[in-house]
Amino acid sequence: LGILGVLPSKQVYAGLSNSTVVLFGGMFVIGAAMFKTGLAEAIGIAVVKKAGTNQVPLMAAIMLVTIVLSSVSSNTGTVACLMPVIIGICQAAKISPSKELMPLAIAANVGGTITMIGTPPNVIVTGALSAAGLPTFGFFEFAYIGIPLSIIIVLYTLFIGRHFVPDKQAGAMDEEAVKAAAEEAGASGDSAPKSKTKMWISGIILLGVVACMALGLKNLPLHTAAVTGAILCVVTGCLKEKEAYAGIDWVTIFLFAGMLSVASAMEKTGA
């Protein structure tokens, strides 16, 4: 559009400064800090191990912790983080991994419906409203549908769906192969000891940002809260600068920003 002269360069790149785009960028960094510090993995391990080795309680714990984590962070990252832990527990309990991994994947998908940044389609429809000059969805407005939907999915899976989950029996699994698969899916693969202090810091930052968004403070817009949290993640050492940049889903950022520019062009030309 800029090359063809439909829009001046200022308008072509204006979408990158849109408040919703900035909000996404900030939350991506905060989510990355959860995984890098090991907080997400620690939460997952604690909850899943607390459930024991009985198939149904284990399935319930897996789905609940996955829904919570995927609502404020990457669905793929959540699955990659929990997958090796779940496979290890399944092996120890003599449970088919497929019986727990399918609920893990389903929970990650449904958990993303709870917040505006939970899954790319939420981003796209929010972008469409913004591009049309209409009020956009609030950060938690998806939760009115997402939370009841999540509850229904969990209950259905526990009482009915689990009977239809394929029972893929497997022999001894190669731990290195499992780790490699998790890393390919998005896990950090960093086996270095994690700092509990940084875990606490990243958790407090996340809770603080989410609380500000839930309260809807007039003097602290959503995007300002998200960026402040992202900066704190770097300043406190939870993430290095390069890790913060790597944690941002740039495809989603440019998709959203690009839609705004296209909408501006259509409005200007009357298309």
Regions found by a protein language model. Name each.
Residues L1, N75-L82, M102-P103, I114-G118, ...:
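Hydrophobic alpha-helical membrane segments of integral membrane proteins
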Residues L1-L23, V29, F142-T269:
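Hydrophobic transmembrane alpha-helices of multi-pass small-molecule transporters
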Residues G2, F35, Q91, T115, ...:
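Short polybasic/polar patches that bind polyanions
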Residues L4, G25-G26, L64-V65, C81-L82, ...:
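Membrane-embedded alpha-helical core segments of multi-pass
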Residues V6-S96, G247-A271:
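Membrane-embedded alpha-helical segments and adjacent helix-loop junctions characteristic
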Residues G25, M63, P84, L104-A105, ...:
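Residue-level recognition of transmembrane alpha-helices
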Residues V65-S74, I106-I117, A211-K218:
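Transmembrane alpha-helix interface/packing and boundary motifs in multi-pass membrane proteins
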Residues A93-I106, G111-A185:
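Juxtamembrane and boundary regions of transmembrane helices in multi-pass small-molecule transporters
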